[in-house]
Amino acid sequence: MKFGPNTTQIYIPLDLQINILLRLPVKSLLRFRCVSKLWCSIITSHDFRNRHFNITSSSAPPRLLIAFQDFYGEKLLLVSSPNPNVSSSSTSSCCVPYKDLSKVEINGRKVYNAVWGLTCFESRLKVGICNPSTRELHMFPQIKFKNYPDIFPCIMYFLGYDRIEDQYKVLAIDNLPWRLEYKVVPILRASRKDKGSPNISIIVSFDVRSETYKNSNVPSKLLPMDTSDNFWTANCNCFIGDKTLINYNGKIGVVEKPQHGRFRMWVVEDAEKEEWSMNTFYLPQSASGLDFKVMNTFYTGEICLVTEKISDPFCLFYYNLKTNSMRSVTYEGLLHMATFKQALQFSVSYHYESLVSLET
């Protein structure tokens, strides 16, 4: 570095440089790869990527990933947003400025889930993985099943991550009414129909590392379902008719669609004994008249709700299960594109910024 007429070189130890870089956001690190070959080598290394992810995921709350499918079902808008943590009260609300949003538009039909910085989506009968932070994506060859119909195929995909082996895996599910076939298995949960037992619903837990699964029965008296409703839909959580399968404090939870200002939630208290608990929650009067559906649960102990009809400005509602209060977050200018104002589907999930590269 130059100071006055003399040239003075300041030496910064490599360990200190790395520690400084580890605390920078992904956007800055992508630019700093061009500073020098040394920095590029450091930032793109496997060890640095993992250390950076561990630091950012433990020191700051996760961001939100809001995915919109356009009116024509051809493009996806992925929006990464800061996660406003507002003290819950029935009247609390806040607004996220448009400038704070990170947006990526990709060719795709549906977003399935987001896992440790990556997002799984479908595009023209193929499955793809996208890193919204680096804007990289990778498309896999079409996955085919035996004796599968060419017209209106019914395949769903989920992304899983094995932290011990540091390996991402994609699960492809053949969801034909008369069979259920798996190609790859991650640790995600969903409900399936057991052929020959239309009144029995099953929770299937998948393990990413061992690629094995186990079943747990759902008591019909707690969760009655008919055969027409017993299907999955693709999201970071799973919909079963008018009910949503969620992760509630590490336990399996099922939340029904709010109706008449209230909703019920079932939670598995003992998976081995198949013991369930049920609680009824009441929405505040300020939410009366709004038609909600459940999207997900978050680390704050809140359930994310959205209105069935997308509005501009776009708004998310958070219901606190402990205080029975609700807050709202508004995103102004988010749906300025005409094709996304009439989005067919949308989802909300956690998102952690990651440097993981999808280049092959």
Curated annotation (Swiss-Prot):
PANTHER family: BNAA05G37150D PROTEIN-RELATED, F-BOX ASSOCIATED UBIQUITINATION EFFECTOR FAMILY PROTEIN. It comes from the Eukaryota. InterPro entries: F-box-assoc_dom_typ3 (IPR013187), F-box-assoc_interact_dom (IPR017451), F-box-like_dom_sf (IPR036047), F-box_dom (IPR001810). It comes from Arabidopsis thaliana (Mouse-ear cress). This is Putative F-box protein At3g47150. Residues 6-56 form the F-box domain. Pfam families: F-box, FBA_3.
